[in-house]
Amino acid sequence: MSLHADRITYTESVHHRWFPGTVDQVAQVRAYVRDKLSEFPAVDDAELLTSELATNAVQHTPSNLPGAGFGVLIEHEYGKSVRVTVHDGGSYFDAPYVAQPEPDSEHGRGLFLVDALATSWGSHATLSGRKTWFCIEN
């Protein structure tokens, strides 16, 4: 069963890891996702989207404070879907949103990519931060 009460499916593999909240850890997140989802057809998309959420955690939340960090949860239903959740120190009130950056801007496209490539995505506040997730279905 999934770890999420709002979604009843049979999850065949679940992986969780905590990462320090530093920029260099985004590369570690990418490698972690690639390792755990190596046989998932959309592994490239899952890796990219997870790195975008991890980057947001490090750049826009208290997850980057000394001693803080963020968690990555991967739920994989073989041959069907993957759901990745990034649990960071984000605000209870400030939800992430898809920005409309200027055409020549170097930043602000992370959630645009998530919105474009994921089957679904969302974010909700918890008592310990914010969980932002995406789903990719085959």
What would you call each of these model-derived segments?
Residues 1-16, 58-138:
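Conserved beta-strand-loop-beta-strand hairpin that lines the nucleotide-binding pocket
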Residues 1-48:
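Bergerat-fold GHKL ATPase/HATPase_c domain
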Residues 41-66:
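Conserved ATP-binding N-box helix of the HATPase_c
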